[in-house]
Amino acid sequence: MSGRFIVLDGIDGCGKSTQLDHLLGWLPGSGLMPAGAELISTREPGGTPLGRSVRELLLHTRAEQAPAPTAELLLYAADRAQHVERLILPTLERGDWVISDRFSGSTMAYQGYGRGLDRQLIDQLERIATAGVQPDLTLWLTLPLEESLRRRQGDQADRIEAEGQVFLQRVIDGFAAIAEQRQWSAIAADRPPEAVSRALERELMDRLG
């Protein structure tokens, strides 16, 4: 594989979508990408046609039809396996670049730390679903819980976001532990979007340049 795989991760409200859009415009002219390489934007869950159906099951199902915690974990793994095999791996093998809104770290943070599911099981499922494909760089947008809640006031929460503050704090703590274990790049997101964008650009130049 000669392409590069970049992931933006963090809790809801941290600005992943805004910064992903910025990087889609910035990266092709940054000098980091080889001439002729394409930049593909994707997300988890929902980066493939099958994944979009899984996303609806995971995030927008009525309470009485919501998956149980272990079923939820397996659905995320199925989405990821399809995503890697049908989109991420073929793109990297062509020499193109992939930038994704979330990847396997989110599953460990939300299902492992947030829900308290068996982390060894999550690791096993990750190895199966990713087939060894891992990001070249994960950019973790850090945000305190209070700021996440403030930014999302008035927004319609999906099923995971609606779990409550104690759950979300466990997720934040999980992200911090995972970031240290996996040597992610932590970028403070509690500042104006333009400042976050400049910090991301510097980190990409330092790590991939």
Swiss-Prot record:
Residues forming coiled coils: none
Keyword Iron: no
Domain of life per record: Bacteria
GO cellular component: cytosol
Any one GO molecular-function label of the UniProt entry: dTMP kinase activity
Keyword Secreted attributed: no
Residues engaged in binding ATP: G10, I11, D12, G13, C14, G15, K16, S17
Pfam families in the cross-refs: Thymidylate_kin
EC number: 2.7.4.9
One of the GO biological process terms: dTDP biosynthetic process
Catalytic activity: dTMP + ATP = dTDP + ADP
InterPro entries assigned to the protein according to its UniProt record, in alphabetical order: P-loop_NTPase, Thymidylate_kin-like_dom, Thymidylate_kin_CS, Thymidylate_kinase
Keyword terms: ATP-binding, Kinase, Nucleotide biosynthesis, Nucleotide-binding, Transferase
Family: Belongs to the thymidylate kinase family.
PANTHER family the record matches: THYMIDYLATE KINASE, UMP-CMP KINASE 2, MITOCHONDRIAL
NCBIfam families listed in its UniProt record: DTMP_kinase (TIGR00041)
Role description: Phosphorylation of dTMP to form dTDP in both de novo and salvage pathways of dTTP synthesis.
Protein's name according to its UniProt entry: Thymidylate kinase
Lineage per the UniProt record: Bacteria, Bacillati, Cyanobacteriota, Cyanophyceae, Synechococcales
The gene coding this protein: tmk
